[in-house]
A protein has these predicted regions:
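Sec-dependent signal peptide recognition
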Residues: 2-8
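Solvent-exposed serine/threonine-rich low-complexity stretches and specific carbohydrate-binding patches
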Residues: 64-79, 113-116, 169
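Electron-transfer interface patches adjacent to heme c in soluble/periplasmic c-type cytochromes
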Residues: 148-157, 161, 165-243
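Bacterial Sec-dependent N-terminal signal peptides
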Residues: 10-42
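Short Pro-Gly-centered beta-turn/loop motif in secreted/extracellular proteins
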Residues: 79-95
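Short, ordered, surface-exposed loop/turn motifs in non-cytosolic proteins
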Residues: 46-63
């Protein structure tokens, strides 16, 4: 049976009996503003290392650091139905996002987002219903990286460069402990070893010329302000593989 948590976030007031051990950070104060209510059924929260967290956060355009962030506790059980509320969101906050953040409130991967500029003066609660999401590390990479920046060449429209498909349901099996078709003796992803993983090599500094296509440009174009965070997230996922 799903467990349901009602979690309210108010910038000036924190009601302890509702928030449990959920962490909150506020980077700026605000007068009365917009309210966003996230509804989601989440799994995989407890699989994250301590440096990352699953959060509902408000961002200003051009700033990769959240103005306000609410972090879900790592003890949240799988298949938990969560209702999470952000209140007092002023006009400087342009998006509300379900995201993977780090300890500095930096956005690493966006899992779902709503454009608050479409609700400039509303007094009604803005509802953000994202359905069921697996937020474990690989699933987050699938949703926030592969689906956004990779499947155009690896899986969509029947195109799979290097015979690699990175669409949902295919990516893990085609990456982990699978030999590269381009470089002999190298795994696409060597579970537990970033240094032996072609994916890590081609996305990190020095990987520009490993293959005929410069994959570092994928990160620089899609993740301008947080390339290093995405690289770290990929490496953390690889190092955590125990297959």
């Amino acid at each position: 049976m799903k467990k349901k948590y009602l979690l309210f976030f108010v910038l000036f007031l924190c009601v302890a009996c509702d928030s449990g051990d959920i962490e909150e950070h506020v980077a700026s104060s605000a007068n009365k503003g917009r309210i966003v209510k996230l509804t989601a059924t989440l799994s995989g929260i407890g699989t994250w290392e301590s440096g990352f967290a699953v959060s509902l956060a408000g961002f200003t355009t051009g700033d990769n650091y959240a103005q306000v962030v609410r972090t879900l506790p790592s003890t949240t059980p799988d298949n938990t139905e969560v209702e999470l509320v952000l209140s007092n969101l002023d006009a400087e906050i342009n998006t509300a996002e379900l995201a993977i953040t780090n300890r500095l409130r930096e956005r690493i991967i966006t899992l779902a987002s709503i454009n608050l500029d479409e609700y400039p003066e509303t007094s009604d609660t803005i509802r953000m219903d994202v359905g069921t999401i697996d937020v474990a590390p690989f699933s987050s990479l699938q949703r926030g990286l592969f689906n956004v920046a990779c499947i155009q060449c690896h899986g969509s429209n029947g195109r799979s460069a290097a015979g690699l498909t990175l669409t949902e349901g295919q990516a893990y099996a085609q990456l982990v402990n699978v030999p590269s078709t381009r470089i002999e003796g190298v795994m696409r992803v060597a579970g537990g070893d970033t240094h032996a993983s072609l994916l890590s090599q081609i996305l990190n500094e020095g990987g520009e010329a490993i293959l005929h296509y410069n994959h570092t440009e994928v990160l620089s174009s899609q993740f301008k302000e947080n390339q290093e965070g995405v690289r770290l997230l990929i490496d953390e996922w690889i190092n955590g593989i125990r297959d």
